From Swiss-Prot:
Coiled coil: none
Keyword Transferase on entry: yes
Encoding gene, per UniProt annotation: AAT2
Sequence intervals crossing the membrane: none
Protein name, per record: Alcohol acyl transferase 2
Tissue expression pattern: Highly expressed in the cortex and skin of ripe fruit.
Signal peptide residue numbers: none
UniProt keyword list: Transferase
Length: 459
């Protein structure tokens, strides 16, 4: 494994990539889902590719991606603009064509030497996605930063940071797919982008018709452990859920839930319970977990165009007092998670938009008693092919304070799910202990299974 002190990343001068052709100069309003306070942050994504001379012999990934970016921005030209804030904090994009930030870099390391260090939480993220001073604001700053780092093995790492108000994971995937298609020679994206953010404006008059526990103001009762403002107190680790862990968890679920619960539901219930125990929250206080639910598709009955790349999700919250969550079997948490997810439909999303307008675009709750989880295992980042084949890893680079992203991961030959978590250092050790306990195989099963029962964590 390459020691951190040895790794050297050399960056060339930062540049602005503008659309390859002139684009409309106009102002475009974001939706009332887009511009909520809780989405006014940057999301880092990392994508790692092996050298593949049989597919792209003698091609320079920096040159190919730079040119494809410029061509894709002709279609996604709002991403080359800058955000402005209007009356009542309403966000709009000044489509001025100023461009996105791009930097070419090289590192004296191979992909093999990096090993698990490319997985979330990526400890080398600051090297592969340098935070240029003044570039990470929300208003008046570039909406996208892309760094392409060439490795000595011929592979490369594409890391990016996107302003979340502009798009969610499916929306970002549409943009990345367009870049990839053009990198492979296409003249236009196979799915043309659609702005139409007015489709998710609030109703007239706005009216809150659903319960939204995710936006409730609450006092932090996590025993003083959780202070998100003190980032030096926070640590990140990732935890792996493979076949063994899922088998043990499923054995704890009542029969009437087994056939209807997903892997995502079960992991979420497990994390919620273990995290609450680790934070030592007052037993009488309410704790919540939110599952990000995509509004696209027929299931939730929200009719959006195929190329819509704005934020189209809500995160309904399951809520419980800490004591029953910690003391009851896992099925208790699982039922609450499933019920919360089931509340998501078009009416729920419309009610969210109305709430955000009526209450001044509030932040979701930001106390330690709240957890937000997002399933990125089927997001499609692993299918983005710039001409070098599929990435060996692609997805969110780390957890973001209260938010954890589930990503696919192959541990040796087994497919599983990797979950990065962010917790105070004192709570992280307790969290790992609780997770190991709840995924521990019974003694009678261990005799039949020689695999380690210790859940794998990655620093």
């Amino acid at each position: 494994m390459m020691p951190f002190s040895v790794l050297q990343v050399k960056r060339l001068q930062l540049e602005l990539i503008t659309p390859a052709k002139p684009t409309l100069q106009e102002a475009k309003f974001l939706s009332d889902i887009d511009d909520q306070e809780g989405l006014r942050f940057q999301v880092p994504v990392i994508m790692c590719y092996k050298d593949n001379p049989s597919l792209n012999k003698n091609c320079n990934p920096v040159k190919v991606i730079r040119e494809a970016l410029s061509r894709a921005l002709v279609y996604y030209y709002p991403l080359a603009g800058r955000l402005k804030e209007g009356p009542n904090r309403k966000l709009m994009v000044d489509c001025n064509g100023e461009g996105i930030l791009f930097v070419e870099a090289s590192a004296d390391v191979t992909l093999e030497q990096l090993g698990d260090k490319i997985l979330p939480p990526c400890p080398l993220l600051e090297e592969f996605l340098f935070n240029f001073p003044g570039s990470d604001g929300i208003i008046g700053c570039p909406l996208l930063l892309v760094q392409v780092t060439c490795l000595t093995c011929g592979g490369f790492i594409l890391a990016l940071r996107v302003n979340h108000t502009m798009c969610d994971a499916p929306g970002l995937l549409l943009f990345l797919t367009a870049i990839a298609e053009m990198a492979r020679g296409a003249h236009a994206p196979s799915i043309l982008p659609v702005w139409e953010r007015e489709l998710l404006f609030s109703r007239d008059p706005p009216r809150i018709t659903c319960a939204h526990h995710e936006y409730e103001d609450v006092i932090d009762h996590s025993d003083g452990l959780y202070a998100s403002s003190n980032q030096s107190n926070m640590v990140q680790r990732s935890f792996y859920f493979g076949a063994k862990e899922m088998r043990v968890l499923r054995k704890q679920i009542p029969p009437h839930l087994i056939s209807t619960c997903s892997t995502f539901d079960l992991i979420t219930a497990c994390l919620w319970k273990c995290r609450t125990l680790a934070l030592n929250i007052n037993p009488k206080e309410a704790v919540r977990v939110s599952c990000i639910v995509n509004a696209r598709g027929k299931h939730n009955n929200v009719r959006l165009p195929l190329g819509y790349y704005g934020n189209a999700f809500a995160f309904p919250a399951a809520i419980s007092k800490a004591e029953p969550l910690c003391k009851n079997p896992l099925g208790y948490a699982l039922e609450l998670v499933k019920k919360a997810k089931a509340t998501m439909n078009e009416e729920y999303l419309r009610s969210v938009a109305d709430l955000l307008v009526l209450r001044g675009r509030p932040q979701y709750s930001s106390t330690g008693s709240y957890l937000i989880v997002s399933d990125n295992t089927r997001a499609g980042f692993g299918d983005v092919n710039f001409g070098w084949g599929q990435p060996v890893f692609a997805g969110p680079a780390k957890a973001l304070d209260l938010i954890s992203f589930y990503v696919q991961h192959k541990n040796n030959t087994e497919d599983g799910i990797l979950v990065p978590m962010c917790l105070p250092s004192s709570a992280m050790e307790r969290f790992q202990q609780e997770l190991e306990r709840i995924t521990q195989e019974p003694k009678e099963d261990i005799c039949n299974n020689l695999r380690s029962t210790r859940i794998m964590s990655m620093m």
